[in-house]
Amino acid sequence: MTRTGREAAPPARCDVRPWAGAWNPHTLTNVAQNRSDDAAASPDAAPSGPSRIDGVDAARAIAVFGMFTVHLGVDSMGLLSPEGYAWTLHGQVRGNSSALFALLAGLSLALMTGRTEPVTGDAHRSAAVRVLTRALLIGLLGILLDLTGVPVAIILTYYAGFFVLALPLTRLRSGALWAVAGVLAVLGPPLSFLLRDTVVDPEPRTSSLSSLTEFLLTGYYPAITFMAFVAAGLAVGRTDLRSTGVRLRLLAAGAGLTVFAYGGSWLLLHPLGGLDRLVEEGTAFMGGFPIAPGMDPVLLAQLREGVMEEAESISGQVPTDSWWWLAVNTPHTGTTFEIAEAVGQALIVLVACMWLAERARWLMYPLASVGRMPLTVYTGHILVLMVIVAGDAAEWRQPWLLEWFVLGALVLATVWRLVAGRGPAEAGLAAAADGAVEIVEERRRAP
């Protein structure tokens, strides 16, 4: 959940506070960048500049707030009433926020393992110990949050598994990582379809992660889909994100992927007849309906709309009753088009956040503060939901609840960052990871 640059001895904590001496509009950002609050900091090589990029933290906060939006639902929104606007926002962040979260996890892994140049030897071993320690603790935290009984799909247990699966990829450079992401995006969806149709027995799914099959194929955040996001994030993290040229290429790639996703899906479903094939073959919620020349256009439009509504309701992977499902591009379907669209939008959000963080630092400071402690904020919102559900579940759906969650996170994270720097959960992870590295190194040195 946290990230770093190359292996480096932590710099001395800066004791300057933004209210000390003459006011400078950039003081808050400069103080924060000079603090040793990079939870994944490692001790082998000093980075050449500030260890964090505030825009990346801001993008991570947007991912967290997107998951707030999905978890709380449209009824919790007050600002975007009437309901139509709320559904528009919900549809935009559903799927995309968790994909952005996973992509930024990959980016964090790249920063923990050498930034633009993968670390090797002892440095890579130390980084791997840190990553595995974090994965273990994040996974345990995810299990504990599952036990709260809050009816949301906890991503942390999946997230921990993604870290473990991604470790071999941390030795690769950006070009190879983009190739891995592309292969996963193209081959993963049909492989998932084939395995779920012929090998994997259907099993009831809960909001918790309860089996390896769920983690890999059938869960809310299946690795066969989400590792494409992690690999893409690693590829992004292996580039020089402070370079204007790199940012422009990422922006162009994001726009291109988004156009490909929407255009490719539309071409297959409409001009090439995929949507009508789904109507004729039937779906889980409606039987097949043969389409004949001269059919009532109103009825045909209703049938097509029914198929698209079912596509919008998918959570994790498409049904296996028709290969044409792989042509859809709706959230959480795990198709090639959905992966491309989610990566494209994630790249656009990331570049926009980096641009804004450099030009409106004071405005973006609270958002970046949330992004510096995402594990703390994510855990906190689940615990608050637990209290709400235990008291009166109806309160969960009250208007303006989402806005209060977002405002509370912004205020608390900003105050905590000013006073203490690193978030409490992030500090705990960092201490545990550093301790694990020390234990491993002591055992290696022992006769």
What residues fall within each predicted segment?
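Basic polycationic patches enriched in arginine
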Residues: R3-R6, R13, R17, R35
